[in-house]
Amino acid sequence: MSENSIRLTQYSHGAGCGCKISPKVLETILHSEQAKFVDPNLLVGNETRDDAAVYDLGNGTSVISTTDFFMPIVDNPFDFGRIAATNAISDIFAMGGKPIMAIAILGWPINKLSPEIAREVTEGGRYACRQAGIALAGGHSIDAPEPIFGLAVTGIVPTERVKKNSTAQAGCKLFLTKPLGIGVLTTAEKKSLLKPEHQGLATEVMCRMNIAGASFANIEGVKAMTDVTGFGLLGHLSEMCQGAGVQARVDYDAIPKLPGVEEYIKLGAVPGGTERNFASYGHLMGEMPREVRDLLCDPQTSGGLLLAVMPEAENEVKATAAEFGIELTAIGELVPARGGRAMVEIR
């Protein structure tokens, strides 16, 4: 079977970050007395479901450690590897850091798919690592029933510049760096619903590196940052609000969307992860139409950065985004928490 004829998505039951275990189930898995081990140098651990772990070395520098892997979200092996690696490296940028090294995680059904196809996947990962300026320094592989690829990535960050998802403040404006709808478009493609003019759009967005994160972290008025991935905008924004004790107002019409996404939602191109996300976070939302909910809960793979920015830093953030060619979009604001109001209010 050639690399050009292969359809990797046929070999997996899930796709991309839509493979994630639901937040509710994950809470059960991680709940343990042993998880309460306290190391004063561990600045970021499990407590706030942040993008990566951060460890203070005590010399003004902290180490960032993260891992991310999933099953194919696209059919092309090289693109699958590139997307998976870009997605994993993004966690370092979302914490405000600089990646320094990565190792690969590969699960491969060796009785179904050739090693040459696995090599193409790995080459895609290596390409993304080169884009980020790091080496793919090694890894680990197993014989698995479904193809899996990802990275474990190490980064560094000045300790004072660590950006958490839990340090937002009321008064911050919310900005997104990529459009939503990746899960919808990739599902539409799997269902053979995707129009010719929309082919490749999701892949292009997923391959965009969130490299601007380190520069955003240098701006004092950027109070919190996270990347929008498997739990959707609603999930990651809810975690930001819960960690900071604030609430959010979001302008639905302002949210950047991939072309055709609302049409595909009406046609039923909604990934399974959407329902899992709503089951975990839906109680935090106000009333809204089903199609709005399906977009806000859409699992993103290698999605954009979500920034909480104080108004006085808005111009500097926009200028930084322009330097990286990012179409930055304001989607709402954070407000003081008040009883009787939804944590995430959609207008």
From Swiss-Prot:
Record-level GO cellular component terms: cytoplasm
Protein name: Selenide, water dikinase
Functional summary from the UniProt entry: Synthesizes selenophosphate from selenide and ATP.
Protein source organism: Escherichia coli O6:H1 (strain CFT073 / ATCC 700928 / UPEC)
Keywords noted in UniProt: ATP-binding, Kinase, Magnesium, Metal-binding, Nucleotide-binding, Selenium, Transferase
Cofactor note: Binds 1 Mg(2+) ion per monomer.
Family that this chain belongs to: Belongs to the selenophosphate synthase 1 family. Class I subfamily.
GO biological process: selenocysteine biosynthetic process
Binding-site list for Mg(2+): 51, 91, 227
Taxonomic classification: Bacteria, Pseudomonadati, Pseudomonadota, Gammaproteobacteria, Enterobacterales
Enzyme Commission number(s) of this protein: 2.7.9.3
